[in-house]
Amino acid sequence: FIIIGEIKNAYEQILKRDKIKPIDTVRLNQLNGEKSNLENNLKDIEQVKFTMKNSLNQCIQRNYNQLSSLPAYKNYQTQFNDSEMILQLVPEGQLFPLENVGSKSNYMFMHLCFYLGLHEHMINVGQIHVPQFLFIDQPSIPYYTGTSNEKIGNDDKTKLLDAFSLLNSFISYITTEKKDSFQIFMVEHAPKEYWTENNLTNFYTVDEFINGKGLIPSDIYNE
């Protein structure tokens, strides 16, 4: 009797269930279409990311190719690693980037190339959300230790002039070839003769903080 009771109860539960509804083919096709669109959008996003990354690397490379102070890394390819957010150099004919590029001077040049390339890329794609200017604080840091009346060697002077020339040529490229605008604000320890005597026409000295004159006027903190 127990077994019969269990069977009867199970049968009654089956009868109480909702009847199986036929498949709504129209709705099914609609959902399948939405799924396909989402999958295609994902592919499009990945393609856009790939294209934008290549464009960024090309802009960085254009600036890097103008340098003459990295002879050991001539013909290397610049590659922005978006997973680690760093710029790397890939030797010609190789697949993997260098782990280290040596001196502070080399990293300073890579720093300049990245940010100039980034702004160039954003100008190329017509973005409007990032202002077209850079603030650069003392690119001469690798060559000056901070002592007063300090002089640097000829090799370091050549490298620093190379960095200034890169900034100057970038402004010319954006304003002349791209027909756009850009501005660089630079606070620098090196003397102004670097640009006044080397035809860096896009440089303009706003003020000099020498002989006791500072960014904050002395009469403010002497009161």
Predicted features along the sequence, with ranges:
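Extended, charged coiled-coil "arm/hinge" scaffolds of SMC/Rad50-like chromosome-maintenance ATPases
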Residues: 1-94, 125-131, 219
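Flexible loop/turn segments at secondary-structure boundaries
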Residues: 45, 52, 96, 141-145, ...
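Conserved catalytic network of the ASCE P-loop NTPase/AAA+ motor domain
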Residues: 102, 125-128, 173-179
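Metal-dependent nuclease catalytic cores in nucleic-acid-processing enzymes
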Residues: 113-124
